[in-house]
């Protein structure tokens, strides 16, 4: 049985029809060009993990909460508490921007790649600039009040926000370099569960720079056009790509086993 997935067609070198790539595929390329190439050229994708349904529920509740203030064109209390001079942005396409399978879209004409990504929320400041907002949820002993240092796995979150900033700019919007993470941390210091989880929520900025996105898309296209499988990349938490490492070790073990069977 082939592990290739047929949700979309593999990329054909030189094709004239625009090819659709999500924000997550950009992140995949940044981590491991080999896994990216196998995905888009052969539709051999990484094994999927179970969905984080608790995180998804928190995202949806945050959206409902901010939408109430959006309808009234008023700042959310978290925005007031953090002296953020902005309100949730009202736009007819907001729900499309937030939907995973549509998102904010643009056709990158130099590569003929259709790039899209679903944003959690958008605010607008007093200067009329759009602010990209990303909701995050976790559970730790201490609340998350800032991202980890550059070079850590939190760089994934930085790149995520910067791609959304780039996408909005490609659609003609004035976008602030400063985005915000609304980070909810589940408390583990309480006496018991008692059928509920309490969260401590912090809002903190990220000063994004999306200059890297353009060159990365060009590099992705060059990778897609090549018939040579690129080198192995890195794992999200550092070190060599775990998926490529596993695939290589399992293949080597399988080949040794088959060779041994032939001898016997």
Predicted regions span which residues?
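Mg2+/Mn2+-dependent nuclease catalytic core
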Residues: 97-215
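Serine-centered coil/turn micro-motif
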Residues: 49, 76, 155, 240-244
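Metal-dependent nuclease catalytic cores that hydrolyze phosphodiester bonds in DNA/RNA
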Residues: 1-129
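Short catalytic/ligand-binding loop motif for oxyanion handling, primarily in non-cytosolic enzymes
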Residues: 37-38, 45-47, 140-143, 187-191, ...
